[in-house]
């Protein structure tokens, strides 16, 4: 037969209190929101990189990059912009809406007919492809964040 071991109940109770404090109520809600914002920041980083920039001759006076700048509303960093986005909470679902307000964004994303209606310009699918990549990587990203959060609870 095995022998009994020693258990320090004070440390166990302290761990229980710390776990309850860190994983309930508003603390849990803010953790989930930070996870959503991190995923949004990663999505923005990928979609901004994939968004094409128009090339114009210098003499035209046009400047390319309007569509790319549209992802952040003209603000400089995608990560900083993602942190400023509002997280909507519907039941047990957290939603961040990422929109490019540039009027021709959907045409570049999905493709469109040519001006003379005799051809088709293929879409770039910058959002669709980026969303798929983030969706595939999300479990690992969230697992790492959860491990880090639980690690904070184990530090007594």
Where are these regions (language model features)?
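Short, Lys/Arg-rich flexible segments
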Residues: 1-156
